[in-house]
Design a protein with these regions (language model features):
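Charged, non-catalytic interaction/linker regions at domain boundaries
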Residues: 1-214, 218, 222, 230-234, ...
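Positions within ordered alpha-helical repeat solenoids
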Residues: 222-225, 297
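Alpha-solenoid helical repeat scaffolds
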Residues: 225-229, 301
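Histidine-centered, metal-coordinating catalytic motifs and their short helical/loop contexts
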Residues: 270-324
């Protein structure tokens, strides 16, 4: 018997998804990450319900109606959506030494699921169009006992929320790319912190917009910081390719002379931009400055409404440079 954590997230950026769609993003003996259309998602939901029939044999008429109403609501609300499905199973024999308090205070499933979610959402975001909303909405999370593939006991309740954001059709080629990226980044230390932070910015309805913005900003900040070891080499290499009287040469030379390799965040970003995105340095540099100013103003007490925090712009800028990094690593 396994103790299983099952999570489901609605893609905010996909509409009119094929209802029978099913792709494995990742799968091993105990962990599964899938993309599902509505019919496939509903199959899993109904199989879970049928597996619990013995437990629910004594349900009242009202309780049975509530279950039917929940299934009806799923069909009404989510019939055209796609879902990210995460299934993490741990054999009961590996958990039985824990007391109930030890197990449920911090279930070991959660870290495993978080790592899978981080890698999957970062990979998918990197492989979809930049104009598509990268956010997700968690619509369910539950712990179950499963034996021989059948759920026999439920430890938590199903939760459903609704949220609508701009979307696009699903392109299967994007998922082919996302699977390749997932394999490249999953469980690698250099990506773990970055993708973990970024993925937390993708669930604004659960984490609140402020927390999502902080997560997006921190993912960008940490990404830049982790590139520190490359910056000196990047900068010196760029100087060789430029004329002494160009603005870029003078700016980079000034940074190197004044900071002696100890760069401020803004300077680090500029140097990375010269390496990854030389044709649009000024545009990206100004965008980074603008986002950083809003972030600093907010945390120094300026009255800024949370809805005006540049969450999507920060996600977009991170996505852009994350893709540059992936391209350099996947060649």
């Amino acid at each position: 018997m396994d103790i299983v954590l099952i999570q489901a997230f609605k893609f905010d950026g996909i509409y009119d998804a094929p209802q029978n769609y099913e792709r494995d993003i990742y799968k091993d003996d105990y962990n599964i990450v899938k993309m599902l259309g509505f019919t496939k998602y509903l199959d899993i939901f109904e199989n879970k319900i049928s597996g619990l029939n013995d437990e629910r044999r004594n349900l009242t008429h009202i309780q049975k109606e509530r279950i039917e109403s929940e299934i009806h609501n799923l069909k009404v609300i989510y019939h055209s959506n796609a879902f990210l499905y995460i299934d993490v199973a741990i054999p009961y024999d590996q958990l039985k030494h824990l007391s109930s308090e030890q197990l449920w205070e911090k279930p070991p499933h959660l870290e495993l699921a978080s790592n899978l979610f981080s890698a999957a959402t970062s990979a998918i975001t990197a492989c979809r169009a930049s104009i598509v909303s990268p956010s997700y909405e968690k619509i369910s999370e539950g712990f179950y006992a499963r034996q021989n593939g059948v759920i026999i006991k439920e430890f938590s309740n199903y939760n459903i929320e609704q949220n609508d954001i701009s979307m696009m059709h699903l392109d299967d080629r994007e998922i082919d790319s996302a699977i390749a990226v997932f394999k490249h980044i999953y469980d690698k230390k250099e990506f773990k912190t970055i993708t973990s932070l970024f993925s937390q910015s993708l669930i604004p309805t659960e984490n609140a917009r402020l927390f999502s913005f902080i997560s997006a900003w921190r993912s960008l900040e940490v990404f830049i910081a982790k590139s520190q070891q490359d910056i000196q080499e990047i900068s010196l290499g760029r100087l060789k390719d430029k004329s002494d009287d160009t603005p870029d040469y003078k700016f980079i030379k000034k940074i190197l002379d004044v900071t002696d390799g100890k760069y401020h965040l803004l300077q680090r970003f500029y140097l990375l931009a010269t390496y990854y995105n030389e044709n649009n340095i000024e545009e990206d540099f100004n965008e980074f400055q603008s986002i950083q100013k809003v972030r600093n103003d907010y945390f120094h007490g300026t009255n800024i409404d949370q809805k005006d925090l540049p969450l999507e712009r920060t996600q977009k800028l991170f996505r852009k440079y994350f893709i540059f990094k992936l391209h350099s690593g996947l060649k």
